[in-house]
């Protein structure tokens, strides 16, 4: 019985870790997009850089 509980705890911690690492690139994209917006440019998510809006 203790083994099952331990297994559940380990998997839930791993899931939480996976979710947080999954979310951080999204946050980075938002930050980068905001930086590009301040320069009057558009954000290219594929190449992760600021580009002129009309070229995209």
Curated annotation (Swiss-Prot):
GO cellular component, one term: extracellular region
Subcellular location: Secreted
GO molecular-function terms, A-Z: toxin activity
Keyword flag Disulfide bond: yes
Modified residues (Threonine amide): 55
Tissue expression summary: Expressed by the venom apparatus.
PTM (free text): Contains 2 disulfide bonds.
Principal location listed in the UniProt entry: secreted
Keyword check for Ligase: no
Residues where Pyrrolidone carboxylic acid is found: 26
Keyword line: Amidation, Disulfide bond, Pyrrolidone carboxylic acid, Secreted, Signal, Toxin
Signal peptide from the UniProt entry: 1-25
Family: Belongs to the caterpillar 2 family.
Function: Probable toxin.
Protein name: U-megalopygitoxin(2)-Mo9
């Amino acid at each position: 019985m203790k083994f099952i509980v331990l297994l559940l705890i380990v998997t839930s911690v791993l899931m939480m870790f996976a979710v947080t690492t999954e979310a951080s690139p999204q946050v980075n994209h938002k930050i980068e997009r905001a930086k590009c917006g301040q320069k009057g440019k558009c954000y290219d998510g594929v190449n992760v850089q600021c580009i002129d809006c009309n070229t995209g």
